[in-house]
């Protein structure tokens, strides 16, 4: 399953960044979706939410686990 991220520029290898809400909506029910920094949008769509600080923590953790 693809991982699609909205609201962040930096993502791990293999994750897809989308720049618009319209593009994000096309991935609903087809990918695991993460919205960074817009809790309202994440709640509206029923997808995962990370604050910008949490996303930074995730990136550091991911890089450590996968030796990036």
Region annotations inferred by a language model:
Residues 4-10, 35-39:
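Structural motif
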Residues 31-33:
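Conserved nucleotide-sensing/catalytic segment adjacent to the nucleotide-binding pocket
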Residues 6-29, 51-54:
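A short, well-structured beta->alpha microelement
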Residues 2-3, 39-68:
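Ser/Thr/Gly-rich flexible loops in soluble cytosolic domains mediating phosphotransfer, phosphorylation
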């Amino acid at each position: 399953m693809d991982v699609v991220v909205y609201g962040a520029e930096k993502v791990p290898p293999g994750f897809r960044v989308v720049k618009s809400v319209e593009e994000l909506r096309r991935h609903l029910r087809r990918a695991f979706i993460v919205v960074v920094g817009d809790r309202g949008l994440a709640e509206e769509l029923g997808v995962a939410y990370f604050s910008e600080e949490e996303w930074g923590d995730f990136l550091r953790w991911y890089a450590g686990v996968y030796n990036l």
